[in-house]
Regions:
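ABC-family P-loop ATPase nucleotide-binding domains
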Residues: 87-164
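Helix-to-loop junction immediately C-terminal to a conserved catalytic motif
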Residues: 48-49
Length: 247
């Protein structure tokens, strides 16, 4: 699914990732944990095509070079990113945004586009399953949303688009327990042998609900340690300094 080899990334002359390696197979859930400034969000930005980085190394997605693909093509090929700070887009209706996004993906997949009625049935089912208020659909995209509402909307998008690889960049940040469960329920509902997840988080609590296959500790732009879910529990007890992070 995703094969990262010797990835280095710099911005404004400062190297953030250096010699980063990671391989994610179809159906796997990987969690990346690390202290602030370790390169977690930089990794997500590089994978999703954010501009401004000087990049070296290789990233293969489904066997093809990911780094040369424009942002929109990455999304069309099934790469999804749930942002830590989702953008507000005034004048764009949430329901229309979701419908357009889904039909764009369906067209690329060679599937028939959904009309308004069929999409409405789909999105109502998704909001009900996630316990999200349907009123969110009639509002402007993320405008005036609370932090929790924005994160819920990201997960709603994910469940509608059904990506092949979903990246969650600290989606659990600032969430209360109810919103955290909505996020985890959305991920768990999509888990399958064909779909993979890369969960980037600072804390272990999200991994109480989403059981990862692998946990990686990112320190100074490199993976310092890899283990199973128990590694996240260990981190909560001993902290990142024990893994080689600077104070």
């Amino acid at each position: 699914m995703l094969d990262i080899k010797s990835l280095s990334a710099s911005i404004d002359g400062k190297k953030i990732l250096e010699g980063f390696d990671l391989k994610i197979k179809p159906g796997e859930v990987h969690a990346i944990m690390g202290p602030n400034g370790s390169g977690k969000s930089t990794l997500a930005n590089v994978l999703t095509g954010k501009n401004g980085y000087e990049i070296e190394g290789q990233v293969l997605y489904q066997g093809k070079d990911l780094l040369n693909l424009p942002i929109e093509e990455r999304a069309q090929k099934g790469l999804f990113m749930a942002f830590q700070y989702p953008l507000e887009i005034a004048g764009v209706n949430t329901n229309n945004f979701l419908k357009t996004s889904l039909n764009t993906i369906r067209k690329v997949r060679g599937q028939k586009e959904l009309d308004s009625l069929d999409f409405l049935k789909l999105v109502k089912t998704k909001t009900k399953n996630l316990k999200i208020d349907e009123k969110i659909l009639s509002r402007q995209l993320n405008v005036g949303f609370s932090g929790g509402e924005k994160k819920k909307n990201e997960i709603l998008q994910m469940t509608i688009l059904e990506p092949k690889l979903a990246i969650l960049d600290e989606t659990d940040s600032g969430l209360d327990i109810d919103a955290l469960r909505i996020v985890s329920d959305g991920v768990n509902a999509l888990r399958s042998k064909e779909r993979s997840f890369l969960i980037i988080t600072h804390y272990q609590r999200l991994l109480d609900y989403i059981k990862p296959d692998f946990v990686h500790v990112l320190v100074d732009g490199k993976i310092a340690k890899t283990g199973c879910g128990e590694l996240a529990v260990e981190l909560e007890k001993v902290g990142y300094e024990k893994m080689g992070a600077n104070k």
